[in-house]
Design a protein with these regions (language model features):
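Accessory terminal helices/loops
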Residues: 145-146, 155-169
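Conserved beta-strand hairpin/beta-sheet module of binuclear metal-dependent hydrolase folds
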Residues: 1-34, 138-154
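Metallo-beta-lactamase
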Residues: 24-41, 71-128
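Short polar/acidic secondary-structure junctions
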Residues: 118, 130-131, 142-144
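Active-site neighborhood of phospho(di)ester-bond hydrolases with catalytic His/Asp-centered motifs
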Residues: 47-53, 78-80, 127-131, 149-153
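Active-site environment of divalent metal-dependent phosphoester hydrolases
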Residues: 53-60, 85, 133-137, 157-159
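Active-site metal-binding motif and surrounding structural segment of the metallo-beta-lactamase
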Residues: 17, 21-75
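A short secondary-structure junction signal
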Residues: 60-64, 87-92, 137-140, 161-163
Length: 169
């Protein structure tokens, strides 16, 4: 999220060029809204959302707040208890990595605070994977091609299907 102080600090030295350089340095290929529409879902079809951790996230867009309606009106956030408690009471050094007011005004009933890993059906699990943050979590799916783990360090298709990668090495 560009409102996160860390990213604001990175953009500041570029002055007026920052908006010109943004699509070159960090292009946006798709938005959540575009993908939801493309696969034939409506925002009200989404029941749950989750993140590997809450750095840089402004959850108000998706879950709503006292001032703004939710893009996903029926969705609840699945989040590890440690992560949720930390984001509500950030230490000064942590604030640089969090969107200002990113959880402010969210209805507490939209938060499902988990104390351990959980199964989400027969072939999907949300696993507590502390390390990067105390509340980091990873999605693990059992697919016809084996296990697929989606976590913090998976940032491109090459991370998830290295056998198809065109990156040398």
């Amino acid at each position: 999220n560009v409102e996160t102080p860390h990213f604001q600090n990175m953009r500041r030295p570029f002055g007026k060029l920052k908006d010109i350089l943004q699509p070159i340095i960090a292009p946006v290929h798709n938005t959540v809204e575009e993908i939801i529409s493309r696969i034939g879902l409506k925002p009200e079809d989404i029941d749950f959302i989750c993140y590997d951790h809450l750095h840089t996230q402004d959850l108000r867009k998706w879950l709503g707040s006292f001032e703004k309606p939710a893009y996903f009106p029926n969705a609840k956030l699945l989040v590890m208890h440690q992560e949720w408690e930390a984001v509500k009471d950030l230490l000064p050094l942590q604030r640089n990595w969090h969107c200002p007011f990113g959880v402010e005004g969210i209805d507490p009933d939209k938060i499902i605070s988990l104390h351990s890993s959980i199964l989400l059906g027969d072939s999907l699990a949300l696993i507590h994977t502390p390390g990067y943050t105390q509340g980091s979590q990873s999605l693990v799916a059992h697919t016809e091609n084996g296990l697929l783990v989606c976590s913090h360090n998976g940032i491109s298709v090459d991370n998830y299907t290295p056998e198809l990668s065109t990156i040398y090495g």
